[in-house]
């Protein structure tokens, strides 16, 4: 018996839709990262993109536990002296709520060339409407907390 190695052109990709309303950011991000990498499939191969497309809706209604809205900070730097900018999670939600889920999922992916390609398969939207109805995404229900 030979070891199976998936090929990128042979992978069938599905579209999933995840409703983030009332869910914790970390719980949504872990499941989205798993689907994006393809670890929920039997044909998972670490060096091949075997993951599916994910549409995350209602990112403006996500929750953070405790005082993370004020305590969690996002940093950016332009590499010029004195240009370190910081933004709290509340400010990020006010500016663009899709940024929070995007950064959470990006942090859960490995840092390599493949992850830069994988993160582009995630689409996040603030409301319930999205332009991907033609792909007929299936609803992904998050498992209940034990």
From Swiss-Prot:
GO terms for biological process: negative regulation of translation; translation. SUPFAM superfamilies: Ribosomal protein L13 (SSF52161). The keyword Ribosomal protein applies. GO terms for molecular function: mRNA binding; structural constituent of ribosome. Keywords: Ribonucleoprotein, Ribosomal protein. Pfam families: Ribosomal_L13 (PF00572). Belongs to the universal ribosomal protein uL13 family. This protein is one of the early assembly proteins of the 50S ribosomal subunit, although it is not seen to bind rRNA by itself. It is important during the early stages of 50S assembly. Part of the 50S ribosomal subunit. PANTHER family: LARGE RIBOSOMAL SUBUNIT PROTEIN UL13M, RIBOSOMAL PROTEIN L13. This is Large ribosomal subunit protein uL13. It comes from Bdellovibrio bacteriovorus (strain ATCC 15356 / DSM 50701 / NCIMB 9529 / HD100). The lineage of its organism: Bacteria, Pseudomonadati, Bdellovibrionota, Bdellovibrionia, Bdellovibrionales.
């Amino acid at each position: 018996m030979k070891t199976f190695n998936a090929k990128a052109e042979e992978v069938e990709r599905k579209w999933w839709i995840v409703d983030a309303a009332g869910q914790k950011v970390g719980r949504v991000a872990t499941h989205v990262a798993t689907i994006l990498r393809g670890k929920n499939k039997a044909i998972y191969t670490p060096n091949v993109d075997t993951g599916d497309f994910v549409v995350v809706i209602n990112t403006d209604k996500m929750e953070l536990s405790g005082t993370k809205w004020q305590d969690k900070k996002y940093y950016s730097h332009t590499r010029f002296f004195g240009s370190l900018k910081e933004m709290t999670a509340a400010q990020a939600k006010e500016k663009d709520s899709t940024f929070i889920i995007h950064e959470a999922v990006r942090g859960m992916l490995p840092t390599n060339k493949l992850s830069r390609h994988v993160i582009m398969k995630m689409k996040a939207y603030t409301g319930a409407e999205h332009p991907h109805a033609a792909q007929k995404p299936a609803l992904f229900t998050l498992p209940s907390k034990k």
